[in-house]
């Protein structure tokens, strides 16, 4: 398991490299794996020490489930453990986060980047329980906490 002591240098937050038709309301499969590969290789080649994807650029709530799975699996395969890879798995409820973590756990990704479900205000105790539940269910995944008090409706 990775710890914060193992992480250093530059962390690149990678967008979900989209296909040309991604803005079309009828579009599906809008992840460009070719662009993702070029972008990920460029970030690592330019010196990124850690990569994070599907974070708060909007991917966690705008990608279709199959698109999320495509970007997770492709990013892990392309990265091939060259640098630590944290995959965003935030969701609007714990069940969705668990489903996303299960997908990430099937890959070579280092861990997950997760903010608490935030549709309704929460408490520090609930947030801690949420992260504990994720850690207990996915002991092989490192967890990077994404903490944004104004957005997540809780301050830790």
Where are these regions (language model features)?
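Active-site beta->alpha loop and helix N-cap motifs at the rims of alpha/beta catalytic domains
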Residues: 2-155
């Amino acid at each position: 398991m990775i710890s914060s002591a193992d992480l250093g240098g530059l962390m690149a937050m990678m967008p979900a490299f989209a296909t040309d038709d991604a803005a079309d309301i009828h579009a599906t499969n809008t992840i460009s794996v070719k662009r993702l590969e070029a972008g990920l290789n460029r970030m690592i080649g330019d010196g990124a020490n850690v990569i994070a994807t599907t974070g708060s650029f909007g991917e966690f709530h705008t990608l279709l489930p199959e698109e999320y799975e495509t970007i997770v699996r492709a990013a892990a395969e392309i990265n091939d453990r060259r640098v630590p890879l944290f995959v965003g798995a935030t969701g609007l409820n714990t069940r969705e986060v668990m489903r996303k973590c299960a997908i990430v756990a099937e890959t070579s990704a280092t861990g997950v980047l997760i903010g608490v479900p935030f549709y309704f205000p929460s408490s520090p105790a609930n947030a801690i329980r949420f992260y504990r539940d994720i850690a207990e269910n996915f002991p092989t995944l490192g967890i990077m906490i994404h903490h944004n008090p104004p957005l997540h409706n809780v301050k830790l």
